[in-house]
Amino acid sequence: MKNPRDILIKPVVTEKSTGLLAENKYTFIVDLNANKTEVKKAVEEIFKVKVEKVNTMRVKGKLKRVRQFTGKTPDRKKAIVTLKEGDKIEIFEGL
């Protein structure tokens, strides 16, 4: 199994993701090759909480242009993790 810290890359802090905190849902950018069970185990191991459900989605990178040069931002994968009632992740508490 992969190292859990390699699976969870960073938390997502947007207006939409902070609105989901009221429903006990936390959003993370995860490794492109990680599946739902790996994400669940990584969150449970790192934050010592119980995960009820994991929803994942692949987000395609956007095309960017600087003058005549075109490029693309990297593709990424987001995971919305629903925790058991009463569990919280401390890094999101100040939002």
Swiss-Prot record:
PROSITE patterns given in the database record: RIBOSOMAL_L23 (PS00050)
This protein's UniProt keywords: Ribonucleoprotein, Ribosomal protein, RNA-binding, rRNA-binding
The keyword ATP-binding is assigned to this record: no
Lineage top rank: taxon: Bacteria
Gene3D superfamilies: 3.30.70.330
InterPro entries: Nucleotide-bd_a/b_plait_sf, Ribosomal_uL23-like, Ribosomal_uL23/eL15/eS24_sf, Ribosomal_uL23_CS
Gene Ontology CC, one term: ribonucleoprotein complex
Molecular function terms, GO-annotated: rRNA binding; structural constituent of ribosome
An annotated GO BP: translation
UniProt-listed PANTHER family: 60S RIBOSOMAL PROTEIN L23A
HAMAP family assigned to the protein according to its UniProt record, in alphabetical order: Ribosomal_uL23_B
Quaternary structure (record): Part of the 50S ribosomal subunit. Contacts protein L29, and trigger factor when it is bound to the ribosome.
Known function: One of the early assembly proteins it binds 23S rRNA. One of the proteins that surrounds the polypeptide exit tunnel on the outside of the ribosome. Forms the main docking site for trigger factor binding to the ribosome.
Assigned protein family: Belongs to the universal ribosomal protein uL23 family.
Protein name in UniProt: Large ribosomal subunit protein uL23
Species, as recorded: Desulforamulus reducens (strain ATCC BAA-1160 / DSM 100696 / MI-1) (Desulfotomaculum reducens)
Organism ancestry: Bacteria, Bacillati, Bacillota, Clostridia, Eubacteriales
